[in-house]
Amino acid sequence: MYHRHSAPPPPGRSRGYPPPQQQWPPQPYQYLPYPPQGPPPAHTFPPPAHRSYPSPYPTPPPHSPSPYQYPHHGHSQSWSAPALPPRPPLEAQQFGNGAPSHYRFQYSACTGRRRALLIGINYIGQPNQLRGCINDVTNMSTFLHERYGYRREDMVILTDDQKNPLSIPTKANILRAMQWLVKDAQPNDSLFLHFSGHGGRTPDLDGDEEDGYDDVIYPVDYRVAGHIVDDEMHNIMVRPLRPGVRLTVIFDSCHSGTALDLPYVYSTQGILKEPNLAKEAAQDLFSAISSYGKGDLSGVAMTAIGFLKKAAKGDSARKRTVMTKTSPADVVMFSGSKDTQTSADTFQDGEARGALSWAFIKSLRQWPNQSYLQLLNSIRAQLEGKYTQKPQLSCSHPLGAWVMRAIEEPA
C-alpha cells in the first residue's frame, strides 16, 4: 500500500532534505519504460534551492553516435604529492569481515572497455531548481575524456537542458541507462557513474539499513514517476557485475552516504567503520533537543524514530547488508555527504558547481595517482573550512592491504 506525504519539506539551500515522515515506498524492480499500469505515485519533494548567482546552461558538445543513441553532451591545503599506491593482486580475494567464508571478489586491472554514465539535473523551471548539476556533468565528461581516455561515444549523458527526449534524465531513461552501463561488462572493464542532483531518504522496507532509511535520488520527473531507491540501483548496477569489473561511482547529492548500498565504509584513516550506537545515541539526543528548540517538532519525531530503529536492528541490518550486498566485482563509491547530511552547491572557477564534483576533479588533476583513501582525504581537504558535509567512501569489498588507484589511466 502506498502512502501520501502529509506536507512538503521546508525550503533549503542544498540538494536534499531531512527524512520525511511518510514517503512513497520503493516500487518493485521494473526496468521497462515508465509509466506502468495504474496511477502515478505521490511523493514528498526536494526543497526549493535558493541561489544568489546566475549560471548559464552550457552548450552540449557535438553529437557522437553511441551504442545507447544519446547525444553528448579555495580552500585547499598544501599537500605534497601522495606516494604511488601499490597495485592489487589479480587473483580472487577473500572478503572476511563477516562475509561468507567461501565468497570471493576480484580487483580490476582496468585494461578493458571503458563506459561512463553522467547524469546532471538542474530541475529547470521547478521550485527546487539547482544551478550547478549540468555544469558538473559537462566538466566530468571533459575530465574523463582528456585525462582517462573515456571516448565520447562510450558516454551516455543525461541532462535536463537537452532536446532529445532520450537524453532527458527521466526515471525511465535513468533506469534504462544504468542497465546500459553494466550490460555485458567483462573482467577488467572500467565503468563510471556520476550523478549530480537532488537526493533524499525514504523509510526502509527491507531491513537492510541501520538507520531505518533508504537513500533515494530524484529524476527530473519525480513528481509523476517517483524517486529511485538505493536498493533498486544496487540491483541494477552492482548485482549483475562479474568478478574483476570496476565500477566507480560519484553521487553528488544529499543523504548519499550509502546511495548504492555498498556494505564497507571507510574513514580517512582507512579504518572500516562500525556502528557506534552509544555515540549515535548522544548525537541523536542533541539533534532532538536542537530541533525542539527551533520549533521543528517533525525533526524531533524523526530523530526519535530513527534512533529507536537503530537501537533495535542496527547490528542485524549491517550483517544483513554484508551478507547480501557484497559483490565479486570491484565497486567503489564516493558520495557527497553522510546519509544524514546535505550536500552543497558551490561557485568555483566562475560557475556553479557541486562541491563534491568540483573537489573530485580538482584533487585528481593535482595528484592523478591517488589511492581511494588518499583521494578521500584530499577531497575533504578541498572542502574543509567551506562546507560541513563530509564526503564518504564505500566499497563492495574490504580494501585490505592493497589499495587500488582511484581511476586507472589508459593502458
UniProtKB/Swiss-Prot annotation:
Gene3D superfamilies, sorted: 3.40.50.12660
Gene Ontology cellular component list: cytoplasm
InterPro entries (alphabetical): Caspase-like_dom_sf, Metacaspase, Pept_C14_caspase
Span list, region Disordered: 1-97
Keywords: Apoptosis, Hydrolase, Protease, Thiol protease, Zymogen
EC number of the protein: 3.4.22.-
Pfam hit, one: Peptidase_C14
Annotated GO MF terms: cysteine-type endopeptidase activity
Active site, per annotation: 198, 254
Residue ranges with Pro residues bias: 7-65
GO terms, biological process: apoptotic process; proteolysis
Family affiliation: Belongs to the peptidase C14B family.
Job description of the protein: Involved in cell death (apoptosis).
Protein name: Metacaspase-1B
